UniProtKB/Swiss-Prot annotation:
InterPro entries: 2oxoglutarate_DH_E1, 2oxoglutarate_DH_E1_bac, DH_E1, KGD_C_sf, ODO-1/KGD_C, THDP-binding, Transketolase-like_Pyr-bd
Lineage: Bacteria, Bacillati, Bacillota, Bacilli, Bacillales
Gene that specifies this protein: odhA
Name recorded for this polypeptide: 2-oxoglutarate dehydrogenase E1 component
The enzyme's E.C. designation: 1.2.4.2
Coiled-coil residue spans: none
Protein's job: E1 component of the 2-oxoglutarate dehydrogenase (OGDH) complex which catalyzes the decarboxylation of 2-oxoglutarate, the first step in the conversion of 2-oxoglutarate to succinyl-CoA and CO(2).
Length: 955
């Protein structure tokens, strides 16, 4: 072929969509139907109509001497350009991506353009006119259309038109259209792929026949999930990835454990058989979990590379593992051993999330997690999503489970490329996997594979799916497995003969039988209803000296009040900070936020990294923290905690998106994978934390008992009744206390800045040890600057956290004390404020108050020792501001009954049972609160004298 001279042709540089634009503009120029760009107008005036005669390729079967100078040819070229773009954008509607259906019928989207162009029209147009990167052998527009339909409408289908970045979109189209994705596999790799499919199918069928009726949530129908994961993992390893994190639900999990994470078949069989086998790793938690929820960590390798693969433990709450695994990855990517922000390297780790086709659009946690993918505080350099699409959710058909054409459509809103692939075409599936990992490593963004198959059995193996999907399951019953399909293809291609295929099958069966033979008989001899909690957990957190030398605290405070020369701190913030200057001097007072900053700095100086996130955490919801400063002239930010001396640990504080569930899951995951780091999540108001309830229930409270998964996550939940209504009053401490058992976490509601300082330092000291556990803190709002919560420097430099505190200047005459009042948090401060105010006369000799700072584990020994001092004690009263059916009362009642014994009565003073946490009228709130306080302090106030009866005040 020869190319003619193009030096005099100004139109030669226009191709494809750009060409279409020029032609449209010329048409407007000729007809005067609209405005034309001045530069193009000048070209039209000088050179006339766009002419491509100089750019015509000559040779056999090519278009020659084609000129668009007449309107008819212009329109034809424009229609071809539009058709090319329609094939790219809508080819997926024609593709054969569902193995249970014939090729999709999306012809209507393309047929209009096709009908308006004859083959002769298409043959007359040079390929380069409509496809600049047309490969060798593509000469005419007809060749272009045939080639693009072949690429875009087979068993691989693509959705890229929503991608906003033109460079990414061009790269994706080039990868697809150049056919580099579908290069023939070597016979060796094809044989290996068949062996893998044979192992997957053989394993599932062996379980089905051997353990009849036991749940396993089979992978059959999307068997290619395992080779797809294999491909992504090993290609990632070739790119230097050190950690691959996988999150998935129960469907197909056993096969992924056995094959991708190389869990021995014998260990899997032992779990089904309830047998003990040497070398098997038992459930690390003391209560355990079902086999299809368990995770595993394994170094996976081939002859060339290796990488560590982690499959996260997972409850049956679909998709909630997603943010947890993202947190794993971020923790693995960051170097936290230097001061300042941690250094992130996204090439060290990446995430694979396996979704269900019903769960991906159905669970809101999916979109919450996707929203994290481009945010500074949460991005992990791209996640590869695989929808294991079996076209049914339990018994619900897809038309009842989503409002979109594809289960993957949600991803379009987050600019994620999507590939749909027929799970019965193994080589197409591997091509999709390769495109996914290449895109992720190059662009550091998410990619989605919609792996479309079917579910061979019911939701679980005891379920009959034909009851609800009779027609589909008639098809499935007669549909060959992907292993059988691929074996036939390899035999037809001469890669393997029938005997060789049978040998592969027999080898798999012999391996399964051999591994099963290693499993001893079932052994339930140690089964017991008495769960043994490890001693280190049962003992609780030991008392730890957490004081910091006064000179060190003063030096830290000086550093906290310093910023670079020329940095313009907002005047109001500057005034707030300058008030802290003398807080550690004699007669100085330390408020909550300063105590926190001092704790953070001292923890960092001891080598513990800190990560704090929340919706307003840099400033603080209540404008109290100001840990990140903003220059008023440049908006540049500065955190003094990044510049303090003697620190070799990172500090990061981030404002989070308006999400609770995904962010809590992320921070939990980060802490699990970075156990040496003090990870803290702060709710904007504690009331909103319940949108993350599934994370508290399934992970934070129970992760160690179920899976041996330790966490030291800190939850900061602003709590306190201040007349602000039902959504700005309660962190619902009753929920956390209901979940409290087996020393699984600490629940506290503090009354002083010093207590906050010490409990943070205590929490930091147990990180990375067997004693670690989460910390749930009901944090203050109005108490942040309350005079009665301020502390002195000596209270920080000396001592330790106190689970219970006695009210000063009360109980001085033990023999006169008749009433012991127990309360916590703001309620205790309200009582103290009333006493200090002196507005009312109370017989304070007859009353003593104990602040329960640590609600769980309850400081029983401390409280018991206080009770013993008062020989004439008549009653123990629990006082709270929450309604009786909320707050700590139902948790405290049995504890107090036991402490009181037979001779001392126990009672309750507080609001009555209510369905809403708080009223909306601030005046009614104030009246109620005053009544609670006065009743608590007035010994003459009689509650019912019946044994163990409870008094509830009513309006």
């Amino acid at each position: 072929m020869t190319r003619k001279n193009t030096t005099t042709n100004p139109w030669a540089k226009f191709h494809g969509p750009n060409l279409g634009y020029v032609i449209e503009q010329y048409d407007l120029y000729v007809t005067g139907a609209g405005s034309v760009d001045p530069e193009l107008q000048e070209l039209f005036e000088i050179f006339g109509a766009p002419s491509f005669q100089d750019d015509v390729v000559t040779g056999d079967n090519t278009a020659t001497h084609f000129s668009p100078q007449n309107t008819g040819n212009i329109e034809k070229i424009l229609k071809v350009v539009q058709l090319v773009e329609q094939i790219r954008s809508f080819g997926h509607t024609l593709a054969h991506i569902n193995p249970m259906e014939d090729a999709a019928n999306g012809q209507s989207l393309l047929e209009k353009a096709m009908n308006e162009l004859s083959d002769a029209d298409l043959k007359a147009i040079p390929a380069k006119t409509v496809w600049q990167d047309a490969p060798e052998g593509i000469h005419t527009a007809l060749d272009v259309i045939h080639r693009l339909k072949e690429v875009y409408t087979q068993t691989l289908a693509y959705e890229f038109s929503h991608i906003q970045d033109s460079e990414e979109r061009a790269w994706l189209h080039q990868m697809v259209e150049s056919n580099s994705l579908r290069q023939p596999l070597s016979n060796q790799k094809r044989t290996a792929l068949l062996k893998r499919l044979t192992a997957v199918e053989g394993f599932e069928q062996f379980l089905h026949k051997t353990f009849v009726g036991q749940k396993r949530f089979s992978i059959e129908g999307v068997d290619m999930l395992v080779p797809v994961l294999d491909e992504i993992v090993l290609e990632g390893a070739k790119n230097g990835v050190e950690d691959v994190m996988i999150g998935m639900a129960h469907r197909g999990r056993l096969s992924v454990l056995a094959h991708v994470l190389e869990k021995p078949y014998s260990h899997m069989f032992a779990e089904f058989k309830h047998a003990k086998i040497e070398g098997a790793v038992a459930n690390s938690g003391w209560t355990g979990d079902v086999k299809y929820h368990l995770g595993r960590e394994q170094v996976v390798s081939n002859e060339e590379v290796s990488t560590r693969v982690t499959l996260a433990n997972n409850p049956s709450h679909l998709e909630f593992v997603n943010p947890v695994v993202e947190g794993f990855a971020r923790a693995a990517q960051e170097n936290r051993k230097k001061s300042g922000l941690p250094e992130q390297d996204t090439s060290k780790s990446f995430v694979i999330l396996v979704h269900g086709d019903a769960a991906f659009p159905g669970q809101g946690i999916v979109s919450e997690t996707l929203n994290l993918s481009r945010l500074n505080a949460y991005q992990t350099g791209g996640t590869i999503h695989v929808i294991a699409n079996n076209a049914v959710g339990f018994t619900t058909d897809s038309y009842d489970s989503r409002s979109t054409k594809y289960s993957s459509d949600l991803a379009k809103g987050f600019d994620i490329p999507i590939v749909h692939v027929n799970a019965d075409d193994p080589e197409a599936c591997l091509a999709a996997a390769n495109l996914a990992i290449q895109y992720r490593m190059l662009f550091k963004k998410d990619f989605l594979i919609d792996l479309i198959g079917y579910r061979r059995y019911g939701h679980n193996e005891m379920d009959d799916p034909a009851v609800t999907q009779p027609q589909v399951y008639k098809k499935i019953k007669n549909h060959p497995t992907v292993r059988a399909i691929y074996a036939d293809q390899l035999q037809a291609a001469g890669v393997l003969n029938a005997d060789e295929i049978e040998t592969i099958t027999q080898f798999t069966q012999e391996q399964l039988k051999s591994d099963y033979a290693q499993v001893p008989p079932a052994d339930t001899s140690d089964a017991t209803i008495h769960v043994k909690v490890p001693d280190v957990v049962a003992k609780g957190i030991q008392s730890i000296d957490t004081g910091v030398e006064l000179d060190s605290l003063r030096a830290i405070n000086e550093g906290l009040l310093s910023w670079p020369e020329g940095f313009n701190v907002y005047p109001k913030v500057k005034k707030i900070l300058e008030r802290r200057k003398d807080a550690l001097e004699e007669n100085g007072k330390i408020e909550w936020a300063l105590a926190e900053s001092l704790a953070f700095a001292s923890i960092l100086q001891e080598g513990t990294p800190i990560r704090l996130t929340g919706q307003d955490s840099q400033r603080g919801t209540f404008a109290h923290r100001h840990i990140v400063l903003h220059d008023t002239d440049t908006n540049e930010t500065y955190s003094p905690l990044h510049r303090l001396p003697n620190i070799n640990a990172s500090f990061s504080v981030h404002n989070s998106p308006l999400s609770e569930a995904a962010v809590v899951g992320y921070e939990y995951g980060y802490n699990v994978f970075a156990p040496e780091t003090l990870v803290m999540w702060e709710a904007q108001y504690g009331d909103f934390s319940n949108t993350a309830q599934a994370l508290f229930d399934q992970y934070v409270s129970a992760g160690r008992a179920k899976w041996g998964q330790k966490s030291g996550l800190v939850l900061l939940l602003p709590h306190g009744y201040e007349g602000q209504g039902p959504e700005h009053s309660s962190a619902r401490p009753e929920r956390f206390l209901q979940l409290a058992a087996e020393n699984n976490w600490t629940v506290a509601n503090l009354t002083s800045a010093a207590q906050y300082f010490h409990i943070l330092r205590r929490q930091a000291s147990i990180l990375g040890t067997e004693a670690v556990r989460p910390l749930v803190l009901m944090t203050p709002k109005s108490l942040l600057r309350h005079p009665l919560t301020l502390s002195t420097a000596s209270q920080l430099s000396e001592g330790r956290f106190q689970p219970a505190l006695e009210q000063e200047n009360l109980g001085m005459k033990p023999n006169k004390v008749k009433r012991l009042v127990l309360s916590t948090g703001k309620m205790a401060i309200d009582l103290a404020a009333e006493i200090e105010s002196g507005k009312h006369e109370y017989n304070l000799d007859e009353i003593h108050i104990v602040r329960i700072e640590q609600l769980y584990p309850f400081p029983a020994e401390k409280v018991q020792s206080i009770i013993k001092r008062f020989k004439n004690l008549e009653e123990i009263i629990w006082v709270q501001e929450e309604p009786r059916n909320m707050g700590a009362w139902h948790y405290m009642a049995p504890i107090l009954f036991e402490l009181a014994g037979d001779k001392v009565k126990t009672g309750y003073i507080g609001r009555p049972d209510r369905s809403s946490p708080s009223g909306g009228d601030p005046f009614a709130h104030k009246a109620e609160q005053e009544l609670i306080v006065s009743h608590a302090l007035d010994v003459k106030y009689n509650f019912r004298q019946d044994k163990l009866e409870i008094e509830v005040f009513s309006n």
